[in-house]
Amino acid sequence: SGALLVNSRRFSVIETVKDSEGQVFVKIDNADASTDFGEGTTVNQILDWNTRYKYMRTHTALHLLSVCLPFPVTGGQITFEKGRVDFDMPESPDKDQITDRLNTMVEADYTVSYDLISQEELRERPQLIKTMSVKPPQNVDFVRLVRIGNSNKIVDLQPCGGTHVKSTSEIGKLFVSKIEKKGRINRRVSVVLQD
């Protein structure tokens, strides 16, 4: 989210995607034939902090959701309005109970920190990987681990390259907005921030 500044022209970023080979593509508005993005062109990024921060809060909330629902993760998505995770679980959970558990973890003000783990150690600890469809990068020596918790209690520990808040209290109040059945054993759980 944000904009690119190129040769004194401002282009709003519409979408950023990464392909299967790790190349990043940025879709912008107002580009035309006169737009010069040749090699060596200086490009400045202008970050939309409010949007980025909302994504960070939602992303971290989805980590907590994966703690509340300790089932394999089959998919997920974050938009400006909500975040969702698809779980491999046969029965739907109770929305109110999950909402209460999420808000309890938010209010606990757990620290979010990072460690690095070698590929070899990750292979020895496969239980750290919660996602069934998205695997941690295989072409790097070390993978970043996200740790949510404090010295007394680790709430979540898993490989993740996303953006997160520094503490769960930054997430703020949230609620489970919808639980959908997506196939015989898939449940899609959507979470919305209250502000």
What positions do the PLM features span?
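Active-/binding-site microenvironments in catalytic and ligand-binding cores
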Residues: S1-D195
